[in-house]
Design a protein with these regions (language model features):
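AMP-binding/adenylate-forming catalytic core of the ANL superfamily
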Residues: 40, 321-378
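Active-site phosphate/ATP/adenylate-binding loop shared across adenylate-forming ligases
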Residues: 1-28, 34-50, 54-315
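Short amphipathic alpha-helical segments
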Residues: 28, 32, 114, 369-377
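Short amphipathic beta-strand/extended segments with alternating polar/hydrophobic composition
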Residues: 316-320
């Protein structure tokens, strides 16, 4: 049980800087920018873009272009050859890949700092929930591992062949915090089933998860929202029981798709019971925001990442957006300067935001129509 003062102190430290950043987002983002450009100045890319002379956000925008994955691919190729300083401020730890849900899978380098931020920010949704609910049994039980495999392809890096896989599985396998908050089954067991992601492959994974978890003290599930739902449907169909009949879960921590609260939550609750659905806005590139309370919005990690938004009236800081204002998100991480993540985001006021979806014509049109007919509700 995580009830000792020492445990509480550790948990509070995980969310403390996040909470503090929400009191003064402008100051938090100023500090984050300073740390980021200091790191970028150590790279060839950063030096080429005058990182050592950046004095503020206007300088940053003037010298660093907003870029997408395609523009950065030549720099990743240099890292692959062994020249990590071409783009990274510190040595490469591993490579990770996206799910490719919107096209070809992207393969990205990961450093120690990047992984540390993924682990720390990724834990905030759980820790914040436990602290605010006073429910530490959530952290004492098992969390269902419904992640993608971490061993999928091979890549030659600096003359050596390495294996890499999907980011969710890789992060789960490397996360030291999971020594205490345990995934069930272990990521190595998931990987042993192979790298496929067909329906049959997922059925084999779901069956492994079910066999390992049945009878165990499972307190939550965490991962890609459609996968969490597909797992529930699988065991209901094959074993005749819903998750709520097998486990007393405290919450579901859901990522990676839009409309989690409005489209998925009602269906998930039919299978898992009337429990909180906690949204996390995460991607291979970072864990950018998470739900802080019962309102159906996410709150940014201003202390770890820099957030800008390209709106119809120009590029603004995310925290500067007025309620109802929206646009294309640009993130800066410890690895990626001014990266066009490809998502649309909308402000709901008071550090609350809603991820609209991918930056695609149909989604933009849908949102324009939504605001036209229901904008008065925002």
């Amino acid at each position: 049980m995580f009830t000792g003062e020492e445990s509480l102190s550790i948990f509070r430290s995980i969310v403390a800087s996040w909470y503090e950043s929400l009191k003064d987002p402008h100051n938090a983002q100023t500090q984050t920018l300073a740390k980021l450009v200091e790191a970028y100045a150590k790279t060839d890319y950063g030096q080429r873009h005058n990182a050592h002379n950046i004095c503020g956000i206007e300088d940053f925008r003037a010298n660093f272009p907003a870029v997408g994955y395609a523009e950065l691919s030549p720099y990743f190729a240099e890292v692959q050859k062994g020249n990590y300083k071409a783009f990274l401020p510190e040595p490469l730890v591993c490579w990770v890949m996206t799910r490719g849900s919107t096209g070809h899978a992207k393969v990205l380098p990961a450093t120690k700092t990047h992984l540390e931020q993924i682990f720390a920010c990724g834990a905030r949704a759980l820790i914040n929930f436990a602290l605010k609910k006073g429910d530490f049994e959530l952290l004492s039980g098992k969390i269902l591992n419904l992640n993608f495999p971490s061993r999928v392809h091979t890549l030659v890096v600096d003359g050596k062949e390495i294996t890499y896989g999907y980011s969710s599985g890789t992060y789960a396998k490397l996360n030291p915090m999971l020594d205490k908050v345990s995934l069930l089954p272990r990521q190595e067991e998931i990987d042993a089933l192979g790298s496929g992601i067909t329906r049959k492959d997922w059925e084999r994974r779901f069956e492994l998860v079910y066999q390992k978890a049945v009878g165990a003290d499972v307190t939550a599930a965490m991962g890609v929202t459609p996968v969490i739902l597909a797992f529930a449907r699988h065991i209901a169909k094959k074993h005749g029981k819903k998750p709520k009949e097998l486990w007393k879960m405290r919450a579901l921590f859901c990522t990676s798709v839009r409309k989690i609260q409005f489209k998925y939550a009602p269906v998930l609750k039919r299978y898992y019971g009337d429990i909180p659905i906690v949204e996390i806005y995460s991607a291979t590139e970072g864990v950018f925001a998470q739900q802080i309370d019962s309102l159906p919005y996410v709150t940014p990690n201003y202390d770890a990442y820099l957030f800008e938004v390209e709106t119809k009236s120009g590029v603004k800081m995310l925290h500067e957006l007025k309620r109802g204002e929206w646009g294309k998100l640009i993130v800066s991480t410890c690895i990626l300067p001014r990266y066009k993540i490809g998502d649309l985001i909308e402000a709901a006021g008071k550090n609350y935001f809603r991820v609209i979806g991918r930056d695609k014509p149909l989604i933009r049109l849908e949102h324009v129509l939504y605001r036209l007919f229901l904008g008065w509700l925002i």
